[in-house]
């Protein structure tokens, strides 16, 4: 038994090792953590190093090993085991436990014994709990060589850890870097289960791998799990930091291989699976399944809050990301499958065993983009396909549920092909192998099938190979939310019906095709046409709903003449309910699309059949094409619609060879879609024939296609702005700027000092009620003011003041707000007249900078910056000393307050951004009429109290008016403020305490009207002379 325990002094950053290189094999390695080179410095052994380490109950070199409560970093390095497992200890153990320790490092340990465990091997549980940073770097178990096909037992498992079960719980960080095993588990291998839980920092598996060391024996099956290999289940859950699997490779499961389920649950930060590979060959045949995950049971992503990335992973055979029995994605943040590849199944391989599959959004979208099949078989090469599902006959259900929650999407930018699942002696419409889209009312989002990110060359390749989105052999139901086919995508239902329930929307966009094939049907109850793409004048065509003119169930070989569907007289397309016009977000088109100009004879839908008996009875009446809309915001106008019918002849072929160079994607569209919509005669359309590599002509079949085109015209008559985006808050902000200026001027009154320097802090609260259909708001501001006063020999007084304040204004019933900063300068003078009359005048300039934030729903927002200027004036007349009442002087007064506010032009950015320009500035003149009472004591310190009340009518009022344009749709309207009451009452009270040359004061003002309540408070001090 050998024990190597050295304390370690190093600077350690618990981040993922982007690169980890060994600079000198004879010395401890330098690691590069996060771009910084970290050097290991080993100090001489000491007795402290072995604290709380026990090796108990040793029997035949097997026992329970425990490391606990070490306060110093522990280093286990350069162990070599050739006669037993466990490279760091040269012995395997019954169990291994590390608990409550400082950093633990297992580096450069090597085990050539077939028992495995490059660092640690235990026949029972391996447990790491409540430790700080844990690093397994460059540990290896490899060396046992076998030849021949009979030896199928795995050897050299677990490049770092090999145990019956492994638990890594409540540690600060876990890093498995550059570990290697011969067979299962390049870093970690278990006979039963693996649990990684409650890690506060990063969990990183990088550059781990297995080696296929049994030649020509399908050894990739054994060398599985490039980072983790479990014969049981794997659970990675409740971790706070990011979880990273980067650049691992193995035979089956480039990152993780499990015999049971593999679950990622309740993690708080990112999950990243990048650059992992499943690699292997048998003779000249490709092997290697599941570039990231190969699970014998379910693969689940459940309630993970951060974004999840599967990117740039590849498998040499099947599944560019995940190979498993079934998928379960629910309640996660956004999920991205990007740029993954495999020979078959760019993203997924499903075993086609009875199970329920769920691809549901949580708080973010799910996006599939550029997941590619690298098949070498003809036209399939290079196509972006997601699934590989082996065809099977199974009497127990294999189901798929696609669900997008409110304000989320599932985007399929790659080909979605689901099918080949059958039940014996059962017609397709009764098959238990169903697909459900948005299964319950909580799923009100959209499932989108789009060719938006597919190049025109690849689309031409797809057309030539007759490859598109499809669901085959599985009855499909669209229950809630939206299913959208757009941006040139084609979707075919084959050997199974699509049934839409009236609580959902089936949306079709530009150049899209919805096809019903042999032994299938479409039941459409609410059809949406995505209008903006049809109005862009860029050569786009209206969407099509069609019966496939070719019977794909017979005569599909290239040397056979295709069979058409013109003799199929069975009803295949059933229409009922409305046709609606929607925008790219599947919402009302009137407030998002530019309908400012009229449109005539615009095709918005084509319905194509080879036999009109394929349409439901009286379909033109059961499909409501009146385009009538309930009262709505946005453009107002009138739609008219009518049907036009034309015919054409197309030639069918069975060619799946690469098309000739002159058959571009646009040429194919022209031949299949473009014809004179005013003609009712048959037009002969040249067939698109691919090169066969020889001179033998292809067998063709001509078929007549009848097209019914829905053509509409639009006449605009006006625009009504949606109150949510009308801009009331900006106009209210201008009114508030004027009110704040006059409130300040009203309190700007000189005192009896000869000279004074004054400073104060102030706050203002305003609450505006909702009136008519205009939003109310509340605002709060705080700031400071400084002033200087001087008095002349004849009672003249001059006062200069400056104030700065910040204000936040929030609109009621929305999340819109404006943050403002104001800079106000004012000059005040007092002129005594006839001993008893005083005239007090003031002028102010108030400059404001503003940031506006507007929120629409949960994902859309706009913001903008602007500034405003306010000019204010005040003239006050007081009749003094005329009404003494004991020690209180009552003084009547009348005052005129004027303000004028103008903003600069405002242009927002973001969703639903608007442009505001000034039509009419805000001007207000109010005249408080009231009485002031003043009390002053003769004792030291002098106490003074002052109170005034007034009735304040509005003498002149001009509402601010802004010309507003919604940039997205060119809709325009006028924006103004929430109506205000014309009469209000005003009160002010102040108190001061004077100590010789120091005066302390506080005052409060309130203005009350039926529409608005304002409270102004300030307090401060002054030096008076």
UniProtKB/Swiss-Prot annotation:
Residues 1-20 form the signal peptide. It is a peripheral membrane protein. The keyword Membrane applies. Transmembrane segments: none annotated. GO terms for cellular component: cell outer membrane; extracellular region. Keywords: Cell outer membrane, Cell wall, Membrane, Secreted, Signal, Transmembrane, Transmembrane beta strand. The keyword Cell inner membrane does not apply. PROSITE patterns: AUTOTRANSPORTER. It holds the Pfam family Autotransporter. Residues 748-1025 form the Autotransporter domain. Residues 659-681 have a biased composition (Polar residues). It is found in: Secreted, Cell wall; Cell outer membrane. Residues 654-681 are annotated as: Disordered. Its main location: secreted. Belongs to the PMP outer membrane protein family. This is Probable outer membrane protein PmpF.
């Amino acid at each position: 038994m050998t024990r190597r325990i050295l304390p370690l002094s190093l600077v350690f950053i618990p981040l993922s090792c982007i690169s980890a290189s060994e600079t000198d094999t004879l010395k401890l390695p330098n690691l590069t953590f996060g771009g910084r080179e970290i050097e290991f410095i080993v100090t001489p052994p000491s007795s402290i190093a072995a604290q709380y380490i026990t090796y108990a109950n040793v029997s035949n070199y097997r026992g329970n090993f425990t490391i606990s409560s070490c306060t110093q970093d522990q280093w286990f390095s350069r162990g070599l085991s050739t006669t037993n497992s466990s490279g760091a200890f040269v012995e395997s153990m019954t169990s291994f436990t590390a608990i409550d320790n400082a950093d633990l490092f297992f580096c450069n340990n090597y085990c050539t014994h077939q028992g495995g465990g490059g660092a640690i091997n235990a026949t029972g549980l391996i447990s790491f709990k409540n430790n700080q940073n844990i690093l397994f770097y460059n540990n290896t178990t490899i060396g046992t060589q076998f030849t021949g096909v009979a030896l199928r037992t795995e050897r050299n498992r677990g490049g770092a850890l090999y145990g019956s079960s492994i638990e890594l719980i409540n540690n600060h960080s876990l890093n498995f870097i550059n570990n290697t095993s011969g067979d299962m588990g390049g870093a970690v291998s278990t006979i039963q289960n693996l649990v990684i839980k409650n890690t506060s920092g990063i969990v990183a598996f990088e550059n781990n791998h297995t080696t296929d060391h049994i030649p020509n024996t399908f050894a990739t099956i054994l060398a599985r799990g490039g980072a983790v290999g479990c014969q049981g289940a794997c659970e990675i859950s409740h971790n706070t930091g990011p979880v990273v699997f980067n650049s691992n490779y193995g035979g089956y499961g480039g990152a993780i291989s499990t015999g049971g389920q593999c679950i990622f649950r309740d993690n708080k930060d990112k999950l990243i699976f990048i650059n992992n590979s499943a690699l292997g060959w048998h003779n000249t045949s490709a092997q290697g399944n599941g570039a990231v995950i190969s699970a014998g049971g379910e693969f689940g992503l459940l309630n993970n809050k951060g974004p999840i990335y599967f990117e740039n992973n590849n498998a040499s055979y099947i599944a560019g990301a995940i190979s498993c029995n079934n998928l379960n994605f629910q309640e996660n943040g956004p999920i991205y499958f990007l740029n993954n590849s495999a020979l078959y199944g760019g993203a997924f391989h499903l075993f086609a065993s009875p199970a329920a599959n769920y691809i549901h959004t949580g708080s973010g979208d799910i996006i599939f983009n550029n997941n590619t099949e690298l098949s070498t078989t003809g036209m399939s090469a290079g196509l972006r396909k997601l699934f590989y599902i082996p065809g099977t006959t199974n009497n127990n259900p294999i189901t798929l549920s696609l669900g997008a929650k409110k304000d989320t999407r599932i985007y399929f930018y790659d080909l979605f092909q689901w099918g080949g699942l059958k039940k014996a002696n059962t017609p397709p419409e009764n098959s238990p192998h169903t697909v459900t889209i948005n299964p319950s009312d909580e799923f009100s989002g959209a499932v989108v099938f789009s060719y938006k990110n597919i190049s025109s060359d690849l689309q031409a390749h797809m057309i030539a190979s007759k490859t598109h989105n499809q669901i085959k052999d599985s009855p499909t139901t669209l229950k809630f939310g939206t299913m959208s086919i757009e941006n040139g995508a084609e979707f075919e239902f084959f050997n199974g019906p699509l049934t839409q329930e009236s609580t959902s929307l089936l949306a079709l966009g530009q150049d899209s095709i919805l096809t019903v094939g042999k032994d299938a049907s479409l039941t459409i109850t609410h059809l949406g046409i995505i209008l903006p793409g049809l109005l862009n004048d860029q050569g786009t065509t209206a969407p099509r709903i069609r019966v496939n003119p070719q019977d794909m169930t017979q005569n599909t070989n290239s040397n056979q003449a295709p069979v058409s569907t013109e003799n199929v007289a069975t009803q295949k397309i059933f229409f009922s309910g409305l046709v609606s016009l929607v925008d790219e977000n599947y919402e009302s088109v009137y407030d998002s699309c530019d309908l400012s100009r009229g449109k005539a004879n615009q095709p918005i839908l084509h319905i194509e059949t080879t036999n009109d008996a394929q349409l439901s009875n009286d379909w033109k009446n059961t499909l409501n094409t009146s385009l009538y809309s309930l009262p709505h915001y946005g453009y107002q106008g009138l739609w008219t619609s009518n049907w036009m019918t034309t015919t054409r002849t197309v030639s069918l072929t069975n060619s799946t060879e690469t098309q000739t160079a002159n058959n571009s994607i646009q040429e194919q569209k022209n031949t299949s879609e473009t014809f004179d919509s005013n003609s009712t005669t048959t037009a002969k359309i040249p067939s698109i024939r691919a090169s066969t590599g020889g001179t033998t002509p292809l067998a063709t079949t001509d078929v007549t296609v009848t097209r019914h085109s829905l053509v509409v015209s639009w006449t605009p008559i006006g625009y009504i702005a949606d109150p949510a985006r009308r801009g009331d808050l900006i106009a209210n902000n201008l009114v508030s700027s004027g009110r704040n200026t006059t409130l300040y001027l009203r309190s700007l009154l000189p005192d009896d000092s000869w000279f004074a320097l004054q400073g104060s802090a102030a706050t203002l609260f305003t609450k505006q009620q909702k009136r008519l259909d205009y939003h109310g708001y509340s605002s709060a501001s705080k700031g400071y003011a400084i002033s200087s006063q001087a008095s002349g020999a004849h009672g003249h007084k001059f006062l200069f003041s400056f104030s700065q304040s910040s204000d936040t204004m929030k609109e009621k019933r929305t999340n819109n707000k404006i943050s403002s900063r104001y800079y106000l300068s004012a000059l005040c003078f007092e002129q005594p007249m006839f001993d008893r009359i005083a005239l007090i005048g003031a002028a102010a300039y108030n400059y404001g900078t503003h940031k506006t934030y507007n929120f629409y729903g949960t994902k859309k927002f706009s913001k903008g910056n602007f500034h405003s200027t306010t000019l204010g004036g005040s003239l006050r007349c007081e009749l003094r000393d005329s009404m003494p009442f004991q020690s209180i002087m009552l003084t009547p007064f009348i005052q005129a307050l004027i303000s004028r506010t103008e903003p600069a032009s405002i242009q927002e950015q973001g969703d639903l951004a608007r442009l505001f320009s000034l039509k009419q500035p805000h001007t207000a003149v109010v005249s408080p009429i009231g009485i002031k009472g003043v009390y002053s004591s003769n004792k030291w310190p002098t106490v003074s109290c002052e109170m005034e009340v007034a009735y304040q009518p509005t003498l002149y009022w001009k509402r601010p008016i802004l010309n507003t344009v919604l940039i997205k749709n060119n809709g325009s309207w006028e924006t103004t403020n929430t109506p205000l009451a014309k009469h209000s009452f005003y009160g002010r009270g102040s108190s001061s305490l004077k100590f010789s040359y120091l005066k302390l004061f506080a005052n409060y003002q309130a203005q009350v009207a039926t529409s608005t309540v304002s409270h102004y408070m300030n307090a401060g001090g002054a030096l008076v002379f």
